[in-house]
Design a protein with these regions (language model features):
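Sec-dependent N-terminal signal peptides
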Residues: 4-13
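Non-transmembrane domains of secretory- and envelope-associated proteins
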Residues: 18-25, 36-38, 43-45, 66-68, ...
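Short, exposed beta-strand/loop patches in secreted or surface proteins that constitute
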Residues: 22, 48-53, 73-75, 119-125, ...
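Short, hydrophobic/aromatic-rich segments at coil-to-beta transitions
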Residues: 26-32, 55-61, 125-133, 152-157
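N-terminal targeting signals for Sec/Tat export/insertion, comprising classic cleavable signal peptides
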Residues: 28-56
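An acidic-aromatic
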Residues: 49-109
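Solvent-exposed helix/loop surface patches that form functional interfaces
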Residues: 97-136
Length: 191
């Protein structure tokens, strides 16, 4: 009976760790985001589409509110550069990425890193258990709900806290794994 329980335990553990594919195997992602922020009791909702070439290139196209619709942000974290297309002025602006914008990539990389190195995190993640991750000294994220696409598990609803105070809710939808992305658009933003 003991052997059966040990074998059963090993089998269950194997299934838990095999339940989701490794996030580190993903090369590209495409998804929609609704971000609801509250800063100093001011509420704002922003919707956008993300094209992400892992590990460090992101295209964000704003779909709402109407005032910002059509704005395109291209982030090249490897070069610490950001390009912003403003349709209202029909111009492209180039600047360095500021620390707040680095939190996106930090959060994604933190989840991938924790999935690789922490058995406890991976086990809870694959079981879709809500959990908290500290991104830096001020920012933490609470993964509230998960979604599963093509055998990969992703955070679906995330609360963002700054110094313990909730500042945003982020909801991901329409997730596509390894879609073909136009690399030239992400790499040659100024052209």
């Amino acid at each position: 009976m003991k052997k059966f329980l040990i074998v059963l335990f090993i089998l269950v553990q194997g299934l838990i760790f095999a339940a989701g594919k490794n996030l580190a195997d993903i090369k590209t992602l495409k998804f929609d985001v609704v971000e609801k922020t509250t800063i100093k009791s001011k509420k704002r909702e922003l919707s956008y589409k993300i094209d992400f070439m892992l590990p460090n290139k992101i295209k964000k196209e704003v779909t709402a509110p109407k005032l910002n619709k059509g704005e395109i942000y291209l982030y090249d974290y490897s070069a610490n550069q950001k390009y912003v297309y403003l349709p209202m002025f029909n111009e492209v602006r180039e600047s360095e990425i500021v620390d707040d914008e680095n939190r996106i990539i930090k959060a994604i990389n933190k989840i991938i890193e924790e999935e690789k190195k922490s058995k406890d995190f991976k086990q809870k993640y694959n079981a879709k258990v809500a959990q908290t991750l500290d991104i830096d000294k001020q920012i933490s994220i609470n993964i509230v709900t998960y979604l599963e696409v093509e055998g990969y598990i992703f955070p679906e609803t995330v609360e963002i806290k700054e110094s313990g105070t909730k500042i945003a809710d982020v909801k991901i939808s329409n997730l596509q794994i390894n879609p073909k992305l136009e690399e030239k658009i992400l790499l040659n933003a100024k052209k």
